[in-house]
């Protein structure tokens, strides 16, 4: 007898669906990538930004090949829906990262959307842009579970040492 149950199996999918189908996904990524090249910083849901990051990095790699490379021009023409951004890719963004191998983008999580669907949101930007820098999130290490437990342990130890050794009052 064979038992089976429904499980969340990806069946070879290595990317997020992000929409109604493969064509919708490509159009969404093209629009996001065009916005990123134009503004050098965009805000979207975490899933979209995370999926976009690889394409943004690869587009810069193609841009570094130069505008005389036929494959680089075809990729730029395909992914950028606004054709006035192709010179920006080859003349502004690619020279900025000429001596760098990868790591052209930065992703930061921002607070979730309040009024709509509470989606996890993020910002993606090209490093070295002229926009004011985003504040990097700093976690308060005093609030982590481990530090809370250690603080409680120290307080318990101090309380037990005080109770076992009462303070001696000087006699006059």
From Swiss-Prot:
Coiled coil: none annotated. One of its GO terms (biological process) is translation. It comes from the Eukaryota. Residues 1-8 form a transit peptide. Its main location: mitochondrion. GO terms for cellular component: mitochondrial inner membrane; mitochondrial large ribosomal subunit. It is found in: Mitochondrion. SUPFAM superfamilies: Prokaryotic ribosomal protein L17. Keywords: Mitochondrion, Ribonucleoprotein, Ribosomal protein, Transit peptide. Belongs to the bacterial ribosomal protein bL17 family. Component of the mitochondrial ribosome large subunit (39S) which comprises a 16S rRNA and about 50 distinct proteins. This is Large ribosomal subunit protein bL17m. It comes from Bos taurus.
């Amino acid at each position: 007898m064979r038992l089976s149950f429904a499980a969340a199996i990806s069946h070879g999918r290595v990317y997020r669906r992000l929409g109604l189908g493969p064509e919708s996904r490509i159009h969404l990524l093209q629009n996001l990538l065009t916005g990123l090249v134009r503004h050098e910083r965009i805000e979207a849901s975490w899933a979209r930004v995370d999926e976009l990051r690889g394409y943004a990095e690869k587009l810069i790699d193609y841009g570094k090949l130069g505008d005389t490379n036929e494959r680089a021009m075809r990729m730029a023409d395909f992914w950028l829906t606004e054709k006035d951004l192709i010179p920006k890719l080859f003349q502004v963004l690619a020279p900025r990262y000429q001596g760098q191998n990868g790591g052209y983008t930065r992703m930061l999580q921002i607070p979730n959307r309040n009024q709509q669907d509470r989606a996890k949101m993020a910002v993606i930007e090209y490093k070295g842009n002229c926009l004011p820098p985003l504040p990097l999130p700093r976690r308060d290490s005093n609030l982590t579970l481990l530090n809370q437990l250690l603080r409680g342990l120290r307080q318990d130890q101090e309380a037990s040492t005080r109770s076992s050794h009462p303070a001696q009052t000087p006699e006059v």
